[in-house]
């Protein structure tokens, strides 16, 4: 700390020189009015800066508050410090410095300061640490302080392990298998020692110590510790029973040794290959409709549907004959003969129609049911196909009463007929293959033109999500699809089928109006 010297130091001959004149051989100064803002250490540093050898700072209370005793190495240094410090202004306080009197020397003879006390204590502690025995380990260097084992190692403890044997190695292997952390630490140690990894095939057995030198018998298994006050033995116990117990324990030890030797020499089995878990896929609609084939490994004979259910007889044009009595007029007989001839011709060529030019009563034939024949043809065509049948469409459709209750069908209008249909109210699980499974039945895939015109566009994102446009070959197929598929429940939601609005361009309608 740089302190400016006073411009005019007091001379000894001036006023107050009696207090400044030092007694012979005195080298202790009394410094008064030290600033209260300074700590004891700062006051001590201030006086040592002016050459003090030892400083004792008094307390801030009492008669000698804010004072300090400074001892210098000689009288000349004390006089020089007095001339520099006396009447020095420091932090608004004027210092007053004088030589200590005999009555004040009692205070200065006490220990120098608290800081010196601390230093002396630290020095003594360090000396005590140095005097400690170097063999005894501290707590920080104990067995395992990270795991709570803070006590030091015993310096007298020394280990002398027996040479490796098959029994010891077998016990180590069992410990490795039962303690995973021990197994990991052994692998770490092998890695640090640059040993070959144990993950390959089984290595050759090295020569063992016990093959050349006969080792001592294995130690018996450790028994639980006896109680502090064991019960007294009975007087009736014989020595023969004790001897038999010792013999049986020796036999058990031998059997245990043999088992351990077998385990040590036993080669491990190959690990079983775990089959990957089969994830069951979601069944498609066409897979759910087809009947699953029976398992080939079953012991029961395979039954066909024809063996279990009665097969319906194929419906065809049956011949209806009338048995007319013999007393029929001759004119009717001629008509019957001509009708029979026509019937035979019709059976040979079914495409030819009935001759309307024949006169007479003739035979009465039933009107063929066109709807039944169409259904039979459609069902027979679609049995092996990959599209839905009309019966399944009818079963899956909701009724007209249900359509009236649903808000989706309230303002329903089929629209202007064209070859494209618009489908809405589709579930989020619906895919293009599901729509193809339904509307593909109205397309003849053998025709390349119809196959090209058949188009499905399913909207999966945005504002049009859950809607689709299906392009069919012609208006007739589109009208049929609208009639049969409207209201069909697909994934729990009924479809709303309409004719698409943008199918026909606007200029066609204008040209039609001009014409």
Swiss-Prot record:
Keywords: Nucleus, Phosphoprotein, Repeat, RNA-binding. Residues 218-230 have a biased composition (Pro residues). The modification Phosphoserine is found at residues 21, 108, 349. Pfam families: RRM_1. PROSITE patterns: RRM. It is found in: Nucleus. The keyword Repeat applies. The keyword Repeat applies. InterPro entries: Nucleotide-bd_a/b_plait_sf, RBD_domain_sf, RBM40_RRM1, RBM41/RNPC3, RRM_dom. Residues 27-102, 419-502 form the RRM domain. GO terms for molecular function: pre-mRNA intronic binding; U12 snRNA binding. SUPFAM superfamilies: RNA-binding domain, RBD (SSF54928). One of its GO terms (biological process) is mRNA splicing, via spliceosome. Its main location: nucleus. GO terms for cellular component: nucleoplasm; nucleus; U12-type spliceosomal complex. Residues 115-133, 337-348 have a biased composition (Basic and acidic residues). Residues 1-26, 107-133, 215-254, 337-369 are annotated as: Disordered. Participates in pre-mRNA U12-dependent splicing, performed by the minor spliceosome which removes U12-type introns. U12-type introns comprises less than 1% of all non-coding sequences. Binds to the 3'-stem-loop of m(7)G-capped U12 snRNA. Component of the U11/U12 snRNPs that are part of the U12-type spliceosome. Found in a complex with m(7)G-capped U12 snRNA. Interacts with PDCD7. This is RNA-binding region-containing protein 3. The lineage of its organism: Eukaryota, Metazoa, Chordata, Craniata, Vertebrata.
